[in-house]
Amino acid sequence: MSKSTLEQPEYVKERLESLAEVDRQLCSMLQEASQVAFTYGEVLRGNAMMKPQFQEHVSAFYSTLDNASGKLKKEIELLDENVGNRLLPINVNKKALGQDDDKLKEQMETLKEFLKTDNEETSTS
């Protein structure tokens, strides 16, 4: 730890650690996205054995995305609650909070339908 990190109040340290965890999750999510793209390409090339890995990577991607967005939302709420008390006044734009949940659910349903349709086509072939 740097000297400046040691001098930070405990609340700030906790927030920084939490944001570092969100950052790690987002990096993990990018790795999963890379694996999704690779395995999807393999499935498209006819490598049906890669389909379970594709499904696992997609599931892990969305799970990590859900977890990271939840933690980030919590940090935004904590920031909003503590503005003026522990932190200098700032403007937190709340317009977009919660809108992505509906889109995420819609994408999950689309993916399930895609995989279900693809499974049916594979089993009838």
Curated annotation (Swiss-Prot):
Q: Which compartment or compartments is the protein found in?
A: Nucleus
> GO molecular-function annotation terms?
transcription coregulator activity
Pfam families xref list:
Med11
InterPro entries in alphabetical order: Mediator_Med11
Keywords in UniProt for this one?
Activator, Nucleus, Transcription, Transcription regulation
Biological process terms from the Gene Ontology for this record are:
regulation of transcription by RNA polymerase II
* Assembly and interaction partners: Component of the Mediator complex.
By sequence similarity, the record places it as follows: Belongs to the Mediator complex subunit 11 family.
- What does the UniProt function comment say about this protein? Component of the Mediator complex, a coactivator involved in the regulated transcription of nearly all RNA polymerase II-dependent genes. Mediator functions as a bridge to convey information from gene-specific regulatory proteins to the basal RNA polymerase II transcription machinery. Mediator is recruited to promoters by direct interactions with regulatory proteins and serves as a scaffold for the assembly of a functional pre-initiation complex with RNA polymerase II and the general transcription factors.
Name this polypeptide is given: Mediator of RNA polymerase II transcription subunit 11
Q: Origin organism of this chain?
A: Candida glabrata (strain ATCC 2001 / BCRC 20586 / JCM 3761 / NBRC 0622 / NRRL Y-65 / CBS 138) (Yeast)
